[in-house]
């Protein structure tokens, strides 16, 4: 029995069938599974501009495999384009909108399964949230990574352009060089090319078995990506027949596998937020502390941007995520019995993958010679982050810094100060009221961090925030500070010049002010008026949970 029988079977459903006949159904089609094709195609961003080709290939393949595909659209927000603007407040919000849209279309039409096609950062977790909520057979198709831009023999990504802004203000480059970077950073379709958020989340989804092997590192414009989309549709039809559902795959062990792979590839801090949200939706007991536990045992073995040398297409050519998983599996760092949407275990899928990466590449290192001996996403706690915070410490030359607080109430104020060269070596920059509630929307701080790096202060300044960081960020940065300032977190009590310690070795984020003084400040603090009271941002601020629990909107703290 199919779920779609509710709209296709029986005399009472004659009007329903009449509507379906108008969109291409014939007599023989009413017993076939109805499959949603959630198409994130958009000309807003290079991340999504190629998705229509993939969605149409999947649609065709689903029909040939015996399904009845029904295409519908989902939205996207371009993080790269909205970065540093008020529009960035809508980025994390779009994750919830995408999840709500897919859930609404699929459940509203009694669909039997869904294939979601996404590209930009929030497309992946948005689709996964919907899949976990609905628990109908599901497959995710990633739009693919952009190929690197080229300039002077060097690979460029969009982060190169952000860093160039800092370089021009510090006199390291001129406007002509800035324009050259701008014109060459993004050469075509695909998501941002380093191990930034989109590629991190696609790798996590592949690891958890809801997308096909090798698909998360394919280039958007290559033929194999379109072929993989078609194969994904065939797998979805089989999954409907076999009744393979997302919650069969999204187990505690699957999330641990995803975290292990994210550590191994040097992935984005945003993965912490998104995996916590997906796990909470799936009913899996995952906490922020699990990331620290796994970090302690899994090294970083991939030399990938933003802190490394290579981009995601290089990882693909070196063996992709299956090669990384094979190394972890052989070392006992992966649960090989986890199942995938193809009906096979990871042990089975990885059986023919070599136990060693190719000798003619430098992207994937053996575990005996890692980039870093432990994972790069550290969970820091202390009186500034009682619930926790997330620090990305790969490539950090100064993992411990105690310095004076430079306090800013918004990203814009901070960026202006950086570009005016008012931030000095040894400072601890604090950007607050940028959390899920306070922003609202938890903006990414790529513009300030890139400007700091561009001015040569990346190893000399710490930056902490209750907002987020782009997957392209590196340096001594600590985000997701919880509780956030807007709900009374200690970060809201910091004053200009206070001493703050950021210690990645001791996992400490501490405001060096005695408790008596903090109690006085807390008594004097009052909750600020919300920046938005209506529209989607006002609604989001009223509903959203703390970042330490994934910043979801459908489950109160």
UniProtKB/Swiss-Prot annotation:
Query: Sorted alphabetically, which SUPFAM superfamilies does this protein's record hold?
Result: IlvD/EDD N-terminal domain-like, LeuD/IlvD-like
Q: Which UniProt keywords apply?
A: 2Fe-2S, Amino-acid biosynthesis, Branched-chain amino acid biosynthesis, Iron, Iron-sulfur, Lyase, Magnesium, Metal-binding
Q: What is its EC number?
A: 4.2.1.9
Q: What is this protein called?
A: Dihydroxy-acid dehydratase
| Enzyme class of the recorded protein, top EC level | lyase
Q: List the source organism.
A: Synechococcus sp. (strain CC9902)
Q: What does this protein do?
A: Functions in the biosynthesis of branched-chain amino acids. Catalyzes the dehydration of (2R,3R)-2,3-dihydroxy-3-methylpentanoate (2,3-dihydroxy-3-methylvalerate) into 2-oxo-3-methylpentanoate (2-oxo-3-methylvalerate) and of (2R)-2,3-dihydroxy-3-methylbutanoate (2,3-dihydroxyisovalerate) into 2-oxo-3-methylbutanoate (2-oxoisovalerate), the penultimate precursor to L-isoleucine and L-valine, respectively.
* Assembly and binders: Homodimer.
Pathway entry = Amino-acid biosynthesis; L-isoleucine biosynthesis; L-isoleucine from 2-oxobutanoate: step 3/4; Amino-acid biosynthesis; L-valine biosynthesis; L-valine from pyruvate: step 3/4
User: Cofactor note from UniProt?
Assistant: Binds 1 [2Fe-2S] cluster per subunit. This cluster acts as a Lewis acid cofactor.
Q: Name one GO molecular function term.
A: magnesium ion binding
Instruction: Report the domain of life of the source organism.
Output: Bacteria
Q: Name one Pfam family in it.
A: ILV_EDD_C
